[in-house]
Amino acid sequence: MSDNTVKIKKQTIDPTLTLEDVKKQLIEKGKKEGHLSHEEIAEKLQNFDIDSDQMDDFFDQLNDNDISLVNEKDSSDTDEKLNPSDLSAPPGVKINDPVRMYLKEIGRVNLLSAQEEIELAKRIEQGDEVAKSRLAEANLRLVVSIAKRYVGRGMLFLDLIQEGNMGLIKAVEKFDFNKGFKFSTYATWWIRQAITRAIADQARTIRIPVHMVETINKLIRVQRQLLQDLGRDPAPEEIGEEMDLPAEKVREVLKIAQEPVSLETPIGEEDDSHLGDFIEDQEAQSPSDHAAYELLKEQLEDVLDTLTDREENVLRLRFGLDDGRTRTLEEVGKVFGVTRERIRQIEAKALRKLRHPSRSKRLKDFMD
């Protein structure tokens, strides 16, 4: 890599670490640097199913250690900074009427000052539902700003906003202003968690666990960075080196990341064909086999016509030539009202006739 290239940070997660171990690591890092970012917290905790109480306990620990939360890992982060006042749509997103109306509506809501935020939080403690609504409405822009980061992950922009709003509501209910965090700092975690979980649950035809979605997203970022650095598609070994993963694990993640393709996908310039039209049905007969089978049936019918009616019918029942179900000697005997031994004799005589060269040569070509 050239000197001008930003080295991709390796964020490895030891699967043997417990939740408390990871929290301890984060707190030690926060003490050393004075802050932690929402991104690195989310990345480190992605493999654990954390409930709201556990997350609140962690925020308490951060507060007790004077560790602040920031929205970006560092100044070299290429992600767009969160800007709650920016209500424009992200690049590539078509603004339809519902989205435009929603953005216009929340744009009319005034942002809160720090003092107003505290006053609302105090009222919420007293069970004031109006204060809850006011705090949530004032932070709807924050949800839009965060939702922009997840466009292109398989969910519509408006759906991302809706899921983020659910996280915002949870943050409003759990927020404790006495801990010293700004509400936006606290809410960012819950909004992001709600959106990422929704993407994992809804964005794919086949559901992928949240922690695997995060791994896939990280792998894609590494893959894109290496593509820029190397000028070619990176090998699994090169991706694995950046992520501290075995090449085999990288291949497994890449395989999981593949999206199913619909058999109804249009094919061709006129979109008059579908992908399913070009996929062979492994269980269906090939045209050549079908043609050979039909010819064999015709020849077999001609050969059977040379037998007596009783001989022909006995063979049809014994070998299931009409319905595919073979019968025992006893079953055929009951049909004709004779003994099983008599049926055996009729069958043997009929087969001897079929073995005669005058008849067998007509079927011999189908025996190859």
Curated annotation (Swiss-Prot):
Residue ranges for the region (Disordered) are 69-90
Q: Which domain of life is it from?
A: Bacteria
Where it sits in the cell: the answer is: Cytoplasm
Sigma-70 factor domain-4 as annotated region, ranges: 303-356
Any one Gene Ontology BP term: DNA-templated transcription initiation
Q: What UniProt keywords are attached to this protein's entry?
A: Cytoplasm, DNA-binding, Sigma factor, Transcription, Transcription regulation
Region named Sigma-70 factor domain-3: 214-290
Q: Which cellular component, as a GO term, is one annotated location?
A: cytoplasm
One of the Pfam families matching this protein, by short name: Sigma70_r1_2
Per the record, the similarity remark reads: Belongs to the sigma-70 factor family. RpoD/SigA subfamily.
Name the record gives this protein: RNA polymerase sigma factor SigA
Top-down, what is the taxonomic lineage of the species of origin?
Answer: Bacteria, Bacillati, Bacillota, Bacilli, Bacillales
Instruction: Please state the gene responsible for encoding this protein.
Output: sigA
